[in-house]
């Protein structure tokens, strides 16, 4: 494969990963609403833990109206802040009302960003042409007229299209289930998780289809396909017993983080360092899906994150053992296959650190969790190697120049006299950045720094008045473009960086 083809494939991979990140940014902030709806449905509907006719009436409107509107608002807000979100929610009512018996999550995921983009373009056209003194009139009427038009478009045009798409997808899923072929989906899902497509598959396909199934059947097996912690646990237990060196030593902590914390990316490097282990996770995933399919098991709401604790909380009444069996059998099969591979195949020269770098490169960004598998010296060496790699294309080189211009790795080069707010930013604004912000808050508390607030957010939601932004190096250029007037600091990983101690000294 030529260098040009390699760069094109790499660019395509990053675009797909970015698309998955955008879908995640619409769904993940609303997972709490899914969980609240799931609790209400699991507890109060007929056949629930404590059936209650009055309270069970909450479940239908929540999944039919509330959650699609929240998703549409989130999608519109990502494109054009609150104004885009509000009109996106208004327009989505057209799709919802046209198909009241089908949870319009997919429709909301399309309408939200689309209307947000249209609102942005409308404002860009109208605002420069608005007479002085008529700003409020033009702003309100332009938004109202766009909402009016797009609501009708949603009702008359998008709704029939979505009805057809949902029908085809539902038939495909049902056909796989009835033919007992749904486990074959793991052949795609498990490798995709380890590369970069997990967000696009889980939040773009399984969550909306699962919500549709759960609304009609009371539960959905689709919520278990990507989230089952069993295959990853089997891999890590195999390393605990048959692994060597760093991989064996770190597998114990990784197992806890993965199984109880639900952060699956922690086991990805262990698979990448022995590519034959893809077979183990695929067979483990297929086993879990087959088990749940045979037992007719499913969840009422998304199991996010994919933690065994979440699985226990989501398990329907009377089906706790079925839930455990699906996780256990998936872990056992994955463990057996992984153990055979580790025991009887030749160990490659590639180590855990190199595999971690490969995973991060394929995802197009650093991982704060998997970076715990690497020490300070290895991280610094990785950073140096990455910055001097001959495979970097012109775009990456321009990104490096941008970071140099902002002096993102020299903490002492900036003036912190007016800084009272530090923001950690990542793709979705919920996972790694939340852990980094929590860690820095603890450091500030121990150092007696009480007048500096530390929060986290998604990069595309950084406020325009941000003062100090901390991002992983691969994402810093995006943060700079979002808020060019802020101080930007790059770190190799959120949980382990010498930059924090330097920052403490400057803020004291």
From Swiss-Prot:
Chief place of localization: membrane
Listed Low complexity bias regions: 367-392
Free-text comment about domains: The EIIC type-2 domain forms the PTS system translocation channel and contains the specific substrate-binding site.
GO cellular component: plasma membrane
Region feature (Disordered): 355-400
Listed InterPro entries: PTS_EIIB-like_sf, PTS_EIIB_2, PTS_EIIB_2/3, PTS_EIIB_mannitol, PTS_EIIC, PTS_EIIC_2, PTS_IIC_mtl, Sugar_PTS
Cellular compartments annotated: Cell membrane
Modified residues (Phosphocysteine): 426
Domain PTS EIIC type-2 stretches: 19-351
Record-annotated membrane-spanning stretches: 31-52, 57-77, 142-163, 173-193, 281-300, 321-342
Species per Swiss-Prot/TrEMBL record: Staphylococcus saprophyticus subsp. saprophyticus (strain ATCC 15305 / DSM 20229 / NCIMB 8711 / NCTC 7292 / S-41)
Example GO molecular function: protein-N(PI)-phosphohistidine-mannitol phosphotransferase system transmembrane transporter activity
Record-given protein name: PTS system mannitol-specific EIICB component
Quaternary state and interactors: Homodimer.
Keyword entries, A-Z: Cell membrane, Kinase, Membrane, Phosphoprotein, Phosphotransferase system, Sugar transport, Transferase, Transmembrane, Transmembrane helix, Transport
PANTHER family: MANNITOL PERMEASE IIC COMPONENT (PTHR30181), PTS SYSTEM MANNITOL-SPECIFIC EIICBA COMPONENT (PTHR30181:SF2)
Membrane topology: Multi-pass membrane protein
């Amino acid at each position: 494969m030529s260098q040009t083809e390699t760069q094109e494939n790499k660019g395509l991979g990053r675009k797909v990963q970015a698309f998955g990140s955008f879908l995640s940014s619409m769904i993940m902030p609303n997972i709490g609403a899914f969980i609240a709806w799931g609790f209400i449905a699991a507890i109060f509907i007929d056949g629930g833990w404590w059936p209650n006719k009055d309270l069970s009436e909450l479940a239908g409107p929540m999944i039919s109206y509330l959650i699609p509107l929240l998703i549409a608002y989130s999608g519109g807000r990502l494109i054009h802040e609150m104004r885009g979100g509000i009109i996106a929610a208004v327009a989505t009512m057209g799709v919802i009302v046209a198909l009241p018996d089908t949870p319009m999550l997919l429709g909301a995921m399309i309408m939200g960003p689309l209307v947000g983009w249209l609102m942005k373009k409308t404002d860009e056209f109208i605002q420069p042409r608005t007479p002085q003194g008529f700003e409020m009139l033009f702003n309100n009427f332009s938004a109202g007229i766009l909402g009016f038009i797009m609501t009708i478009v949603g009702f008359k045009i998008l709704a029939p299209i979505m009805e057809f798409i949902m029908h085809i997808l539902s038939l495909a899923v049902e056909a796989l289930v009835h033919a007992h072929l749904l486990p074959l989906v793991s052949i795609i899902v498990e490798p995709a998780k380890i590369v970069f497509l997990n967000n696009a598959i889980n939040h773009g396909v399984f969550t909306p289809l699962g919500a549709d199934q759960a609304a009609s059947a009371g539960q959905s097996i689709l919520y278990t396909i990507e989230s089952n912690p069993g295959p990853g646990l089997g891999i890590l237990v195999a390393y605990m017993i048959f692994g060597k060196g760093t991989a064996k030593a770190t597998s114990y902590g990784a197992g806890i983080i993965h199984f109880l914390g639900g952060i699956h990316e922690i086991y990805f490097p262990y698979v990448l360092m022995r590519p034959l282990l893809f077979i183990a996770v695929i067979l483990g995933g297929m086993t879990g899906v087959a088990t749940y399919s045979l037992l007719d098991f499913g969840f009422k709401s998304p199991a996010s994150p994919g933690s065994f604790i979440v699985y226990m909380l989501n398990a329907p009444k009377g089906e706790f053992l079925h839930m455990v069996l699906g996780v256990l059998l998936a872990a056992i099969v994955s463990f057996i296959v992984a153990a055979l591979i580790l025991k009887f195949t030749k160990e490659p020269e590639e180590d855990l650190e190199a595999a971690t770098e490969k995973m991060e490169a394929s995802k197009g960004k650093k991982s704060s969790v998997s970076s715990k598998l690497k020490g300070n010296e290895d991280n610094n060496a990785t950073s140096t190697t990455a910055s001097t790699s001959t495979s970097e294309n012109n775009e990456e080189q321009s990104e490096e120049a941008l970071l140099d211009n902002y002096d993102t790795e020299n903490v002492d080069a900036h003036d912190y006299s007016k800084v009272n707010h530090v923001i950690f930013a990542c793709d979705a604004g919920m996972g790694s950045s939340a852990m980094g912000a929590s860690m820095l808050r603890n450091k500030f508390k121990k150092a007696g720094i009480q007048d500096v607030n530390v929060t986290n957010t998604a990069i595309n939601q950084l406020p325009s008045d941000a003062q100090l932004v901390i991002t992983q190096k691969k994402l810093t250029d995006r943060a700079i473009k979002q808020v060019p007037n802020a101080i930007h600091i790059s770190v190799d990983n959120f949980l382990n960086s010498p930059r924090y101690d330097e920052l403490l000294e400057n803020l004291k």
